[in-house]
Amino acid sequence: MTVERYDSIRGAEKSLRETQGNGSSSQTFSVLRAVERCFWRCLPYTAMCHPRYAATCIFTRRRPFRVYVARDEKGAVLCAPLHRDSDGGWSVVAGEIVELDFVDFLYARRPLSELTEAFRAVMHKMSEDGIKRIGWRYLESDGITASFLRDWPHSVNETFQNVRIVFPDGLDGYMRALSVNARANISKARNRLRRDGKNVSFSFRSSVGIGDGMDGREVRAQMRRYRSVYVERQESRYRNRGLLARLYFLHGSYVALSVPGEGAFVAMLEIDGSVAAYMEGYVNTARKALEVPRIAMNAEFGRYSPGRLLIVKAVAWLSANSDVRTIDLCRGDERYKLDLGGILYATESVQACTEVPA
């Protein structure tokens, strides 16, 4: 097992592509590309709208990317994208930034013994290069890296709650698994739509061949329309920075920069031609999952519970038109996520020494 080092995401792009087969988060790959390609476009909005992230953004630029790649004769086994720290003794796994809910190494689909060997080789190389400690933000507690770290000197600083919805084939099985109260709320929303004579439509677009494509001027215009719903929901949090907040969420955030793009999707619920709810994010084909860092509802249609209907419509559509069987709603354990059949899981803020234990 050999370990190579690259000083940019672009330089390691081939290896990064090779190591997405074992369920590694699609967010990591897609957003890293957006960060490196469009950093200066992001910075003004990020620094002004999210002051607590400004230092992270600036340091991201000042600490260039470094990517370690473990490979054997069959190809890349593991990729470790880092932000190289200026003091040389501390690095964070790249992706610790606004709206990214998973941060981890990228693993190829290989036997566990090969992944273990690659992990130890990469950590040893980091230690040789003077990186004494490494940090993960939002590391999945039941993931591959977390299982390796159980035998490694490490500390968990904070735990975050996340929710994913796993559904069977067909909408009927999903609905039967919901609580009586959840089914009643969905039924009430549908009845209100019928009584009020509302026309409801659902659409799904992706760049991975599921649903309609995401290219073209029409799609870009549609994205501006549905993102305005998200902006309106966020503006109340940033009243003193209204224009900057709008520019950031429409154009400068990492989700905005990486969707549309490789591995991206958008699902939208419309009522009488207006956006009632939408979600956007990434398709993780290895996990057969949607990763959803951004979901928003239009308050104008609040009486119809558009967010709940969006999830139900998405489950029905995905069951019939794809092999996706998980909608990962990521960080946050809001009640509506659990009512819709969500399952709690944890991500952690972790620090570890790079020195390989005996």
Predicted features, each with a name:
Residues 8, 107, 165, 283, ...:
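Active-site donor-binding loop signature of nucleotide-sugar glycosyltransferases
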Residues 107-110, 165-168, 206:
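Short beta-strand-to-loop capping motifs
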Residues 3-92, 139-144, 148-157, 162, ...:
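A conserved beta-strand-loop-helix scaffold within acyl/acetyltransferase catalytic domains
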Residues 110, 180-183, 341, 349:
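Short capping/connector residues at structural and topological boundaries
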Residues 85-158, 287-344:
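Acyl-donor binding region in acyl/amide transferases
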Residues 48, 198, 327, 345-346:
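Secondary-structure boundary/capping residues
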Residues 106-110, 173-178:
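Flexible, glycine/proline-enriched loop segments at strand-loop-helix junctions
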Residues 157-165, 344-356:
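Conserved catalytic-core motifs of GNAT/GCN5-like acyltransferases
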